[in-house]
Amino acid sequence: MSQTQEKKKNSWELRDVILMACIGLVFAIVYLAVFNVGLGISAALTGTGFSDFAFDVIYGVWFMAGTLAAYIIRRPGVGLITELLASVLELLFGNSGGVAVVITGLIQGAGTELGFALFRYKKWNLLSMTVSSVLSGIFIYFYELFYLQYYMLAPMMHVGHLVIRSISAFVFSALICKLIGDGLAKTGVMKKYAIGQNVKKAVVYDEED
């Protein structure tokens, strides 16, 4: 691939920005709803010894915007910007976390972006999505070590948080996002995006066989 083709492949188009905005908007609403679900789970588990892990079970949901957008559009920067946008909108829609919500969005988006960057933005599959999602969970956990004073927890609590959060990241942000992206691509509505082009190529190859 020539430098001109590579530059064109990695440059954003208006339709990319529009889709990122739409995904950010949808998941801002989802994030806010899931936050309230987490509060409910935490309250229900109070006294059981498991309430500290309530949010970890659903934490993977908060990585979905960036992962899904990146999987569909497949350009550098998409995961970071979409996740950040979703967090800003979540704050505007009423999340009481204040500026910390935006900071977490930025950190989570950075984890997503690094995951795909490790594959040089050339591998768009369940493995790269899993790496991106798990890195998002690890990144935000290091932030919470200080912001939420998790550094005071016992070592096994750290293990518990990271393991549960990583599983949640895989289920929601990797597996479910891949199913959503692939499902949308098969309908043809994503034919102008990289994911749709890949589906089109796969169909052509099948016909040739």
Regions found by a protein language model. Give the residues of each.
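Membrane-embedded alpha-helical hairpins and interfacial helices in multi-pass inner-membrane proteins
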Residues: 44-48, 122-209
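Cytoplasmic juxtamembrane regions at transmembrane-helix boundaries
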Residues: 77-100, 194-207
